[in-house]
Amino acid sequence: MTTTSPLPITDETKVHRYKWLQRTDRSDLMEVLHAGLIAHVGFVHNGRPMVIPMAYAVSGDHLLMHGSTGAGLNRDAKVGTDLVATISICDGLVYAQNLFDSTLNYRCAMVMGNAIPVKGDEKHEAIKAISERLMPGRWDEVVPPTARQMAATFILKLPLDRASVKIRAGAPDGEPVPGIWTGYVPMVTTVLDPVPQDGIEAEEAASLRPAIAHLNHLSRKHLGTE
């Protein structure tokens, strides 16, 4: 797989409902992954379907997902496990001329494949990548993770070669109806000012303001106003 090759459409990844909304440009996949914060990971555990939320980061051609060694998914993944990671972002409410045609603007990516645990030095780098993705600059401001903390954390690595991306943007379909307002209401995730813990004796972390600005930029980038 290359980072510029289009996403292949297979029986597994093909969109059937509103199929014209499917995107095969790999840059669209990366846009969704960089804009989201949580992956909802679906898998089968003890014969039952499960979905859990996981923090993640992108590293090269893989999705790195953060979890606890006590979780059932970790036990299943020791030799690799098939799963689906879904990242969804709601970008707005679409007000059509009737409720049936009213909908959401959204970006959604589903990544499917065999996930394997990350170990050794690669695990350390993966944890750092997820930290830098969620809290840029924080890694260098705090004490390094202990061996016990590392042992209690597991990272799954999922290839990005099997993915389905679906994006809807803009106004409702159909012609306007006289006397009925139609259009859409944009939505973004906003990162607010930090709230210090009671009793701390420290200046505000140097990484905070740049991190907040960066996360807000990612949230608004699709609007074309950042």
Model segments located where?
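A generic structural motif
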Residues: 63-68, 156-157
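Short helix-to-loop capping/linker segments positioned immediately adjacent to catalytic or ligand/cofactor-binding
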Residues: 40-44, 97-99, 115-119, 139-146
